[in-house]
């Protein structure tokens, strides 16, 4: 959902954005090869690195209460030993033992009443009834940023919204290398042909400016499909 835009009828809208950090290796490996649109001779990665070295992210007020007053979390987690052990137990539990469990099944108020849980759920949008396995996987992915939860110092950001800072430079780079972007196009189906041990995409069914059409494929074509999105069905209100 890196689609921040200015809409004359609604103002500036953006459906979502990435909370980035040092270990987005795939993203950074890609953008070290994409030229910056603003700094001649620099890559998007250079631009991002220099920005966060010069102006690192840091919050003096992590949470508010009573309509904007500082909650004075003061960088503390307020986790009891029992709560810390519940988190450690989840971290060590095999994935298959968590398939049908919610976070409420593995944590109790020792965790839910802690400032740590407020930090965690406000950063990663977790609810108590969400998947315990997803919670564990997030722990494993971001364990190196636990110390940065109380002040947001774990996070890094682009100069502008991620459409203008990431998507647009990549689009310009690809267009300069012959990529043909088709706008006002909705893919409705991909037809496959299955022959013995081969499954081949034969036709992309789509609508272009509301008119139904199709793209005939050959065995030499590569088709990459993103089936669904975390912002699918978004509405503004």
Feature locations, PLM:
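Elongated alpha-helical scaffolds
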Residues: 15-33, 60
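Amphipathic alpha-helical segments that form well-ordered structural scaffolds
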Residues: 26-33, 119, 165-176
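Short, solvent-exposed loop/turn and secondary-structure capping segments
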Residues: 2, 134, 234-237
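Glycine- and acidic
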Residues: 9-14, 101, 148-157
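Conserved N-terminal glycine-rich FAD pyrophosphate-binding loop of Rossmann-like flavoproteins
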Residues: 1-19
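Rossmann-like flavin
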Residues: 36-141, 156
């Amino acid at each position: 959902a890196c689609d921040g835009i200015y809409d004359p009828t609604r103002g500036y809208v953006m459906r979502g954005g990435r909370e980035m950090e040092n270990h987005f290796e795939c993203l950074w490996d890609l953008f070290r090869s994409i030229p910056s649109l603003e700094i001649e001779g620099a890559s998007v990665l250079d631009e991002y690195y220099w920005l966060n070295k010069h102006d690192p992210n840091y919050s003096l007020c992590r949470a508010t209460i009573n309509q904007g007053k500082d909650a004075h979390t003061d960088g503390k987690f307020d986790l009891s030993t029992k709560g810390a052990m519940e988190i450690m137990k989840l971290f060590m539990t095999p994935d298959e033992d968590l398939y049908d469990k919610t976070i409420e099944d593995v944590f109790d108020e020792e965790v839910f009443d802690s400032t740590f849980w407020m930090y965690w759920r406000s950063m990663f949008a977790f609810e108590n009834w969400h998947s315990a396995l997803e919670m564990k996987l997030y722990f494993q992915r971001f364990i190196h940023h636990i110390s940065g939860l109380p002040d947001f110092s774990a996070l890094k950001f682009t100069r502008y919204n991620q459409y203008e800072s990431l998507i647009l430079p990549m689009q310009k780079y690809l267009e300069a290398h012959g990529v043909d972007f088709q706008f006002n196009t909705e893919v409705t189906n991909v037809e496959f042909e299955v022959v013995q041990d081969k499954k081949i995409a034969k036709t992309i069914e789509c609508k272009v400016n509301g008119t139904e059409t199709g793209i005939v494929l050959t065995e030499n074509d590569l088709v990459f499909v993103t089936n669904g999105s975390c912002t699918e069905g978004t509405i503004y209100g």
